[in-house]
């Protein structure tokens, strides 16, 4: 086992604080509408430019092991806030630095670290209550756009696009962000349920110009096994032909004789038909077939349920107003499923999302939920250069997460104003003087985001904070973009309550651990042993 270096109390805290400050100082320059960029060197390719706090934090690794421990603890704050709220990582870092700095001073003055932490926790709980009461629920699309605009560093186009996407696919819908192939940023919305499987034969195409098969007012047969022979299907096929409607077959596969028979019937005009493979694999395929069944009001033909193909009747088939099948995707629009059954299925998937521990499973469940509940929107981010596109994509991701958080828990006045107001509303009393000091640490620390936003905008932080606190209006604050004071909500400068709350709770949690640290242990750097001397060249007795 390698030898360790151990640091205690003041020495340990000082080293750790240096690391906290290095990381936080690099991250906090990005805060606010006038926040600066940070350039990250990459081992290959062009450097990356970003204003995203967590991206900056993840790049920082310090040489000194003890300083690095402090930096990594604060990086954890940014990551945790990003995981829960998806935004607010810079605010969380600024808050953590402020609480640690104030706490370190108090510990150096001889106060009890555990009592300080209890005081900090008391004050944070009260601030969270205050924020919950101050939060305003989002009702209009304009308010959604405002949140998106603020989080995208004041870019209105992005805010509008996110508001439009959420309006079209609903709050449960999936909105994905991709890099565009062009310089324009655009929004594409896919109605209905789309999955990644296309037609099994190009002969099914009905629209040669667009290379798609379009079926109107269509029956849908859902089968979980392969179809290689159509003998068992003849009764249901005859019933479909008599109804005069088209048929879509979704099965594990349709092959050989079965596929050939379907193609021949389609070409002769006797049967309007198309076949696609079922989406997904294994258990996920079964679940997705069930989703399609619920959406279209049909049944999955499965021998597990004792249903055989020869016994299938028309009322077991799903129905939809329109189906569009391209080379690699199938879209089912306006399925005939019962609303109550779809809602029940949505609730079931939501409970699975809450229970799962796997990020991959959660992502797949959320995709299924979106396909059932709303639809899918894709924001394609464009720019003149690859570096610009990546920087803009970071901002769109942040804006999207902030907007979802705002819809979930409401909004509070932005620009650090909500926390600034909370600082004068803290009434918590500690059991002793040290706990009181912990409460005061939070009282001072939660002013840090507003101060940082002001100084990044080139204003004098203490004058800005003083002016805001002198005014009693709850929404009165400082617009760093224009340099004006006024009603923050009226000016459209708002923060999602969930983002502010998560940033404060995560910052206080990690800062509390750092304040109460008394010893730090790290491996001693390995000493390079000198290389052995090289033997002399040449051969004995020879003169070279």
Curated annotation (Swiss-Prot):
<keyword id="KW-0067">ATP-binding</keyword>
<dbReference type="InterPro" id="IPR001844">
    <property type="entry name" value="Cpn60/GroEL"/>
</dbReference>
<dbReference type="GO" id="GO:0042026">
    <property type="term" value="P:protein refolding"/>
</dbReference>
<feature type="binding site">
    <location>
        <begin position="87"/>
        <end position="91"/>
    </location>
    <ligand>
        <name>ATP</name>
    </ligand>
</feature>
<feature type="binding site">
    <location>
        <begin position="30"/>
        <end position="33"/>
    </location>
    <ligand>
        <name>ATP</name>
    </ligand>
</feature>
<feature type="binding site">
    <location>
        <position position="51"/>
    </location>
    <ligand>
        <name>ATP</name>
    </ligand>
</feature>
<dbReference type="Pfam" id="PF00118">
    <property type="entry name" value="Cpn60_TCP1"/>
</dbReference>
<keyword id="KW-0143">Chaperone</keyword>
<dbReference type="InterPro" id="IPR027413">
    <property type="entry name" value="GROEL-like_equatorial_sf"/>
</dbReference>
<dbReference type="GO" id="GO:0005524">
    <property type="term" value="F:ATP binding"/>
</dbReference>
<dbReference type="GO" id="GO:0140662">
    <property type="term" value="F:ATP-dependent protein folding chaperone"/>
</dbReference>
<keyword id="KW-0547">Nucleotide-binding</keyword>
<dbReference type="GO" id="GO:0005737">
    <property type="term" value="C:cytoplasm"/>
</dbReference>
<dbReference type="InterPro" id="IPR027409">
    <property type="entry name" value="GroEL-like_apical_dom_sf"/>
</dbReference>
<dbReference type="GO" id="GO:0016853">
    <property type="term" value="F:isomerase activity"/>
</dbReference>
<dbReference type="InterPro" id="IPR002423">
    <property type="entry name" value="Cpn60/GroEL/TCP-1"/>
</dbReference>
<dbReference type="GO" id="GO:0051082">
    <property type="term" value="F:unfolded protein binding"/>
</dbReference>
<dbReference type="InterPro" id="IPR027410">
    <property type="entry name" value="TCP-1-like_intermed_sf"/>
</dbReference>
<keyword id="KW-0413">Isomerase</keyword>
<dbReference type="InterPro" id="IPR018370">
    <property type="entry name" value="Chaperonin_Cpn60_CS"/>
</dbReference>
<comment type="subunit">
    <text>Forms a cylinder of 14 subunits composed of two heptameric rings stacked back-to-back. Interacts with the co-chaperonin GroES.</text>
</comment>
<protein>
    <recommendedName>
        <fullName>Chaperonin GroEL 1</fullName>
        <ecNumber>5.6.1.7</ecNumber>
    </recommendedName>
</protein>
<feature type="binding site">
    <location>
        <position position="415"/>
    </location>
    <ligand>
        <name>ATP</name>
    </ligand>
</feature>
<comment type="similarity">
    <text>Belongs to the chaperonin (HSP60) family.</text>
</comment>
<feature type="binding site">
    <location>
        <position position="495"/>
    </location>
    <ligand>
        <name>ATP</name>
    </ligand>
</feature>
<keyword id="KW-0963">Cytoplasm</keyword>
<comment type="function">
    <text>Together with its co-chaperonin GroES, plays an essential role in assisting protein folding. The GroEL-GroES system forms a nano-cage that allows encapsulation of the non-native substrate proteins and provides a physical environment optimized to promote and accelerate protein folding.</text>
</comment>
């Amino acid at each position: 086992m390698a030898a360790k270096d151990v640091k205690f109390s003041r020495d340990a805290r000082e080293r750790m604080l240096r690391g906290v400050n290095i990381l936080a100082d690099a991250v906090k320059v990005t805060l606010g509408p006038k926040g600066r960029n940070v350039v990250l060197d990459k081992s290959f390719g062009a450097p990356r430019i970003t204003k995203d706090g967590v991206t900056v934090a993840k790049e920082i690794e310090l040489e000194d092991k003890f300083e690095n421990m402090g930096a990594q603890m604060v990086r954890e704050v940014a990551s945790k806030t990003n995981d829960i709220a998806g935004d607010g990582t810079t605010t969380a870092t600024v808050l953590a630095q402020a609480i640690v700095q104030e706490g370190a001073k108090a510990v150096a003055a001889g106060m009890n670290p555990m009592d300080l932490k209890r005081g900090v926790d008391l004050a944070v709980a009260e601030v969270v209550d205050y924020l919950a009461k101050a939060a305003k629920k989002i009702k209009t699309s304009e308010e959604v756009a405002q949140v998106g605009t603020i989080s995208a560093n004041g870019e209105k186009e992005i805010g509008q696009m996110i508001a439009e996407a959420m309006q079209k696919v609903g709050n449960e819908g999936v909105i994905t962000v991709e890099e565009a192939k062009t310089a324009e940023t655009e929004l594409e919305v896919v109605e209905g349920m789309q999955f990644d499987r296309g037609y099994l034969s190009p002969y099914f195409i009905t629209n040669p110009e667009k290379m798609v098969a379009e079926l109107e007012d269509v029956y849908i047969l859902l089968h979980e096994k392969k179809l290689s022979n159509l003998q068992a299907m003849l009764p249901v096929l005859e019933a479909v032909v008599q109804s005069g409607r088209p048929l879509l077959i979704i099965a594990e596969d349709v092959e050989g004789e079965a596929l050939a028979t379907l193609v021949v019937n389609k070409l002769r005009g006797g049967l309007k038909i198309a076949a696609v493979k079922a989406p997904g694999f294994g258990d996920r395929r079964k679940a997705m077939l069930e989703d399609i069944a619920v959406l279209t009001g049909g049944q999955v033909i499965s021998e597990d349920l004792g249903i055989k193909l020869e016994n299938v009747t028309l009322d077991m088939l799903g129905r939809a107003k329109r189906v569009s099948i391209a080379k690699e995707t199938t879209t089912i629009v306006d399925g005939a499923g019962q609303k109550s059954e779809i809602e029940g299925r949505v609730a079931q998937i939501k409970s699975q999302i809450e229970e799962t521990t796997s990020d991959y499973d959660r992502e797949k469940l959320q995709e299924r939920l979106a396909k059932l509940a709303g639809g899918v929107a894709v924001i394609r981010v464009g720019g003149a250069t690859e570096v610009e596109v990546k920087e803009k994509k970071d901002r769109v991701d942040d804006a999207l997460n902030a907007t979802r958080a705002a819809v979930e828990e409401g909004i509070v006045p932005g620009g650090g104003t909500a926390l600034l107001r909370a600082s004068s509303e803290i009434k918590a009393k500690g059991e002793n003087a040290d706990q009181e000091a912990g409460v005061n640490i939070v009282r001072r620390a939660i002013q840090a985001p507003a101060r940082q936003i002001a100084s990044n905008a080139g204003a004098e932080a203490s004058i800005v904070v003083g002016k805001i606190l002198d005014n009693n209006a709850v929404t009165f604050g400082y617009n760093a973009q224009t340099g004006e004071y006024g009603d923050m909500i009226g000016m459209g400068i708002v923060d999602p309550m969930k983002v502010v709350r998560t940033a404060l709770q995560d910052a206080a949690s990690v800062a509390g651990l750092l304040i109460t640290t008394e010893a730090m242990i790290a491996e001693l750097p390995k000493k390079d042993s000198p290389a052995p001397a090289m033997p002399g060249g040449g051969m004995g007795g020879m003169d070279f």
